[in-house]
Swiss-Prot record:
It comes from the Eukaryota. InterPro entries: SWEET, SWEET_rpt. Mediates sugar transport across membranes. May stimulate V(D)J recombination by the activation of RAG1. GO terms for cellular component: endomembrane system; Golgi apparatus; Golgi membrane; membrane; plasma membrane. The chain crosses the membrane at residues 3-23, 42-62, 68-88, 96-116, 129-149, 160-180, 186-206. This is Sugar transporter SWEET1. It is found in: Golgi apparatus membrane; Cell membrane. Gene3D superfamilies: 1.20.1280.290. Interacts with TRPV2; the interaction probably occurs intracellularly and depends on TRPV2 N-glycosylation. One of its GO terms (biological process) is carbohydrate transport. It is a multi-pass membrane protein. Keywords: Cell membrane, Golgi apparatus, Membrane, Repeat, Sugar transport, Transmembrane, Transmembrane helix, Transport.
Length: 221
């Protein structure tokens, strides 16, 4: 029993540490925006999608009474909100960004209205919300597949981040174990694609080393 309790604590701690580490990766973008007072080379859409993901899992955790989900996604949502506000501040073309943000808020309001008004049964609400969060998280993990196809076509991994790949693997594996321990299929299944795509990236790093890319470009110049 003590061993099981220690293992649970280890998994819970890993989920918190690795996930918050993933969320704080945006701090480098925030620092870049503040130093350059611009949004050059900073993508806005990942901030929005991660915000939706955080708020969805936060609602799921609150409905389920899961403290780990609540803490992690509260911090994550706060960080994404900070990144979004900073982007809005430094972005010269605010109209498009404001439209995307307003669309996000509209979708969130519709979602909350549906789950809390049209699904009165708490158990059914939990299952439907869990399914939504799971599908959304899976789509986020699978969305970079276009980049992986580009790597294969160009035989270059310059567009991939090795540290981010490691962080994604550790985070996904931690949440898979967390979902397995809680027997929660929504948490477990939604994070499995993160493990798969991480191993695909590792294979691509092995197949097309970045050092090889640098040598190739040096020869071309």
């Amino acid at each position: 029993m003590e061993a099981g309790g220690f293992l649970d604590s280890l998994i819970y701690g890993a989920c918190v540490v690795f996930t918050l580490g993933m969320f704080s990766a945006g701090l480098s973008d925030l620092r870049h925006m503040r130093m350059t007072r611009s949004v050059d080379n900073v993508q806005f859409l990942p901030f929005l999608t991660t915000e939706v993901n955080n708020l969805g899992w936060l609602s799921y955790g609150a409905l389920k009474g899961d403290g780990i989900l609540i803490v992690v996604n509260t911090v994550g949502a706060a960080l994404q909100t900070l990144y979004i506000l900073a982007y809005l501040h430094y972005c010269p073309r605010k109209r498009v960004v404001l439209l995307q943000t307003a669309t996000l808020l509209g979708v969130l309001l519709l979602g909350y209205g549906y789950f809390w008004l049209l699904v009165p049964n708490p158990e059914a609400r939990l299952q439907q919300l869990g399914l939504f969060c799971s599908v959304f998280t899976i789509s986020m993990y699978l969305s970079p597949l276009a980049d992986l196809a580009k790597v294969i076509q160009t035989k270059s991994t310059q567009c991939l981040s090795y540290p981010l790949t490691i962080a994604t693997l550790l985070t996904s594996a931690s949440w898979c174990l967390y979902g397995f321990r809680l027997r929660d299929p929504y948490i477990m299944v939604s994070n499995f694609p993160g493990i798969v795509t991480s191993f695909i990236r590792f294979w691509l790093f092995w197949k097309y080393p970045q050092e090889q890319d640098r040598n190739y470009w040096l020869l071309q110049t």
